[in-house]
Every structure is written in C-alpha cells, then in structure tokens.
C-alpha cells in the first residue's frame, strides 16, 4: 500500500528527496546551503523542500547513520517532527559531536533522512488516579531512568 507525499521544491537547483535503495524507509534530504560547524556547534540548515504530511501521519527527520558514525554529524532534536499541518521549509538542526574537528556541509550534501509514519491521534482524558480509572498497576510502576537495571560495568 502506497501513500503519496506532496512536495514543493523551493530550490530548483537541488534534487528532490529520494531513497538510496528500493525498500529504504527514509528519503534523503539535501542541504540547501554551505555550513561549517565547529566542534560542539549547531546550525539550522535549510533543505530547499516543503512537504504536506497527510493528516494522521507524521514526518520524522532522522540523522544519516553514516555521517553520525564517521564524522559525528547528528541532529539536535532527533528525530525532528513535521506535523501534518506544517507547510514551511524543512530545516534540520544539525550538531557537530566531534570534540576536535570542524565539519563542513556543502550545498547538495545529503544531511538527514525523512520517514513518514502513521500516528495515533489520542484523546487526552484527565483522571485523578490510574487505580480509580481502572488501569491496573504494573510491575514497573513509576520506575524510570535506569530502574530496569544498569550496565554491567557502570
């Protein structure tokens, strides 16, 4: 089953987002500008495209794994969220995680990948307690942030 995604090319000098391989979940997004990121610095980088995510879906902007592994280029708010009502240019909040070397991003470089997924639009219902709402207690309860066990060496 295929769903279409309307896309506006705001920068005709850049290719449209595309999949590197058949069956890939994400489409590559390209940088619309040259940017140099010093170690630890971040920048909001234009992609030259806007999309109309269908209602009931969400666009998620993820880092490209090769860039993150090889040079430490990632996304500050990973994944970035594109709501169905947003019609502006997709911008990617890049960050250089390398402690020493600057990263140069050139116009036309693939900088992120966009995935479009279905999302459940839940209705929020306030309750005074989970017990009162008939939601059984769980073995986890309110345990979080490491409550399920630590790493053997930490």
From Swiss-Prot:
GO MF entries: dUTP diphosphatase activity; magnesium ion binding
E.C. no: 3.6.1.23
Taxonomic placement: Bacteria, Bacillati, Actinomycetota, Actinomycetes, Mycobacteriales
SUPFAM superfamilies: dUTPase-like (SSF51283)
A biological process term (GO) from this entry: dUMP biosynthetic process
Protein's recorded name: Deoxyuridine 5'-triphosphate nucleotidohydrolase
Pfam families noted in UniProt: dUTPase (PF00692)
Other observations noted: Each trimer binds three substrate molecules. The ligands are bound between subunits, and for each substrate molecule, residues from adjacent subunits contribute to the binding interactions.
Keywords: Hydrolase, Magnesium, Metal-binding, Nucleotide metabolism
Binding site for substrate: 64-66, 77, 81-83, 91
Pathway info: Pyrimidine metabolism; dUMP biosynthesis; dUMP from dCTP (dUTP route): step 2/2
Cofactor(s) in the UniProt record: Mg(2+)
InterPro entries listed in its UniProt record: dUTPase (IPR008181), dUTPase-like (IPR029054), dUTPase-like_sf (IPR036157), dUTPase_trimeric (IPR033704)
UniProt keyword annotation of Metal-binding present: yes
Superkingdom classification of source: Bacteria
Family from the record: Belongs to the dUTPase family.
Protein purpose: This enzyme is involved in nucleotide metabolism: it produces dUMP, the immediate precursor of thymidine nucleotides and it decreases the intracellular concentration of dUTP so that uracil cannot be incorporated into DNA.
Reaction catalysis annotation: dUTP + H2O = dUMP + diphosphate + H(+)
Assembly with partners or alone: Homotrimer.
């Amino acid at each position: 089953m295929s769903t279409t995604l309307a896309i506006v090319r705001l920068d005709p000098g850049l290719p449209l987002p595309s999949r590197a391989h058949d069956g890939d979940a994400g489409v590559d997004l390209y940088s619309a500008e040259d940017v140099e990121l010093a170690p630890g610095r971040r920048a909001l980088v234009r992609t030259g495209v806007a999309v109309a995510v269908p209602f009931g879906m969400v666009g998620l902007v993820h880092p490209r794994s090769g860039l993150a592994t090889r040079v430490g280029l990632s996304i500050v708010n990973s994944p970035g969220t594109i709501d169905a009502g947003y019609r502006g240019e997709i911008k990617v909040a890049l960050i250089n995680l390398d402690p020493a070397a600057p990263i140069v991003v050139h116009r036309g470089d693939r900088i992120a990948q966009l995935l479009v997924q279905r999302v459940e639009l839940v209705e929020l219902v306030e309750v005074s307690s989970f017990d009162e709402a008939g939601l059984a207690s769980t073995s986890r309860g309110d345990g979080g942030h490491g409550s399920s066990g630590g790493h053997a060496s930490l």
